[in-house]
Structure formats: structure tokens, C-alpha cells
């Protein structure tokens, strides 16, 4: 039961973080530097909190494992996360969130071939329904905005980065706990962000995020950190397929919370696709091909 709760919370927190980020005033020139600065703060703060937690639990023995989860952090963080937030900048959260939720398709295929995870036909149907509904939702929501090629490229990079991260992290969790893997993942992503920030500073990119509203910045950082922490716990407790099935509902939460917080209208077709996506998730959750 805890695994399902962590999965749902990861989606809710991710939606809130994306919505707050969507409201930040970013110009095209300042976007990259400020996005990387923001992501660095999210992961650095998370690294400190998780590190202290593991130290207090005397769980700092990583059994010689470092490079695999660190690599997953680079793929999911500096590469995947940067691309995701930049896609929000170019396409808005209402288009980027649903379409980016296609990453489980690639992760599921990788899990099947690399991790040898079994997927029953019922689960395949539910998972396919969730993914197809999410894709149609992205198309429907995106009809009212101008499609941006750069934003689409960032989305592809995001999907590839996230799917690779989830498979590598899941493999590492065969020998370490979810929090331990998350800590090592944060080590990799933090180092990656620092390297990118150093390069951007040499190119005179703006790295100043203090011009933003402090409440918004705090919200993006806190909700983003909580989302990732819950996500990794869900992966550890439920395995990748179920954790991803819950996590991809962030597109639904983003649309629903966008309506409640920012009065973003929801059309009937959007509601229908949302229900279909939820149905696909429910079917996936109850398959018996993977034991908890």
C-alpha cells in the first residue's frame, strides 16, 4: 500500500512543481542558465536531506556501487530534467507534461529486455491504453498553442533520458534500497549540473534565479525534490512498471490542478481522455505478471 501512495504523491508533487515552473518569467536567452541553476538547487538540497537521513539510519554502506546510479542521475537529471523544463518553457506544461509521460514505453521495453521483467497480456493492454490516452491528451491539449520544433526535440531528449534512468536505477535496487540509490543518483546529477553551470558561466549565460518570486522558487524546489524521493521509493516497493504507471498520471494532475489554481479550462474530450488514462493505469496496477 505504501508503494502506491508514494507513486501517487510523486505524480501530484511533479505536477505542482511543473505548474509553478510554468509561471516563472523566463525569456528565451535566460531560460537555459536559470533552468540549470534551479535544477542544481533542487538536487543539491535533496542530496543534503537524503544524505543526513541515511547517515542517521546508519545506511551509508553502498556495497561498492556508485557509477551505475550516478550515471542514471546524469541521464535523468542534467539531460532528462533539463530537457523537460526547457520543453515546458517552449510548449507550456499543458503540452509538455502529457507528451513526456510517453517515457514509460521505452523504459518498459528496456525493462523487458534488460531486467527480464514479465508483462502479462492484460498488463500490456492497460499500459498501452494509458500511453495512447496520454498521447491523445497531449495532442488535444496542444491544439491551442503553436507547436515548437525546439520544444519537441527537448521532449525526445527528455523521454530517452528518463527511460534510461529508470532502468539503470531499477537494476541497482537489486542490491541497494530506494533511498540509497536516490542518494547516489543525486551525487551524479549534482556533479553534472555543476559542470554545466561552469560551462554556461564561461559563455556569459545568466544564472541568477533570485529575480524570481521566492515562494515560486521554493515551491518548484520542494515539490520537485519530494516528487523524486517518492518516485524512487515507489520504484523500490512496486518495481518500475507499476511505479511508472502511477507516476505518469502527473499529466492528469497538471491539467486538474491547472484548472483549480490557474483557471485553465478543461474540455469534455480532455476529461474523457483523462478517464481512459486512469483506466489504463488501474488495469496495469492489478496485473499478476510482477510480484511486489
UniProtKB/Swiss-Prot annotation:
Q: Which Pfam families match?
A: EamA
Q: Which domain of life is it from?
A: Bacteria
> Locate the EamA domain: which residues?
70-139, 160-286
Statement: the UniProt record of this protein carries the keyword Repeat: yes
UniProt KW Cell membrane keyword? no
Q: Which UniProt keywords apply?
A: Repeat
Gene Ontology annotations for the cellular component aspect, listed alphabetically: membrane
Recite the other comments: Lipopolysaccharide (LPS) is a glycolipid that is a necessary component and antigenic determinant of the outer membrane and has been shown to be an important factor in the host-parasite interaction in a number of Gram-negative species.
| Name under which the protein is recorded | Protein LicB
Q: Which organism is it from?
A: Haemophilus influenzae (strain ATCC 51907 / DSM 11121 / KW20 / Rd)
- The gene designation is licB
Amino acid at each position: 500500500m505504501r508503494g502506491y501512495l508514494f507513486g501517487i504523491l510523486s505524480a501530484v508533487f511533479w505536477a505542482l512543481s511543473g505548474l509553478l515552473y510554468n509561471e516563472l518569467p523566463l525569456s528565451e536567452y535566460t531560460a537555459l542558465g536559470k533552468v540549470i541553476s534551479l535544477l542544481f538547487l533542487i538536487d543539491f538540497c535533496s542530496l543534503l536531506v537524503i544524505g543526513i537521513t541515511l547517515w542517521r539510519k546508519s545506511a551509508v554502506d553502498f556495497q561498492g556501487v556508485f557509477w551505475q546510479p550516478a550515471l542514471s542521475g546524469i541521464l535523468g537529471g542534467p539531460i532528462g530534467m533539463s530537457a523537460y523544463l526547457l520543453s515546458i518553457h517552449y510548449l507550456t506544461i499543458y503540452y509538455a507534461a502529457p507528451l513526456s509521460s510517453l517515457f514509460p514505453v521505452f523504459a518498459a521495453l528496456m525493462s523487458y529486455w534488460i531486467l527480464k521483467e514479465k508483462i502479462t497480456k492484460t498488463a500490456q493492454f492497460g499500459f498501452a491504453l494509458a500511453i495512447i490516452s496520454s498521447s491523445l491528451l497531449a495532442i488535444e491539449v496542444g491544439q491551442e498553442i503553436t507547436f515548437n520544433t525546439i520544444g519537441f526535440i527537448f521532449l525526445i531528449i527528455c523521454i530517452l533520458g528518463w527511460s534510461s534512468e529508470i532502468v539503470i536505477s531499477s537494476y541497482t535496487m537489486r542490491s541497494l534500497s530506494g533511498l540509497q540509490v536516490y542518494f547516489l543518483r543525486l551525487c551524479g546529477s549534482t556533479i553534472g549540473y555543476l559542470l554545466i553551470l561552469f560551462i554556461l558561466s564561461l559563455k556569459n549565460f545568466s544564472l541568477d534565479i533570485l529575480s524570481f518570486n521566492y515562494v515560486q522558487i521554493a515551491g518548484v524546489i520542494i515539490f520537485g525534490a519530494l516528487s523524486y524521493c517518492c518516485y524512487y521509493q515507489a520504484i523500490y516497493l512496486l518495481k518500475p512498471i507499476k511505479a511508472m504507471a502511477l507516476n505518469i498520471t502527473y499529466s492528469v494532475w497538471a491539467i486538474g490542478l491547472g484548472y483549480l489554481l490557474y483557471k485553465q479550462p478543461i474540455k469534455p474530450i480532455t476529461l474523457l481522455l483523462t478517464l481512459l488514462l486512469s483506466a489504463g493505469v488501474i488495469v496495469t496496477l492489478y496485473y499478476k505478471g510482477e510480484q511486489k
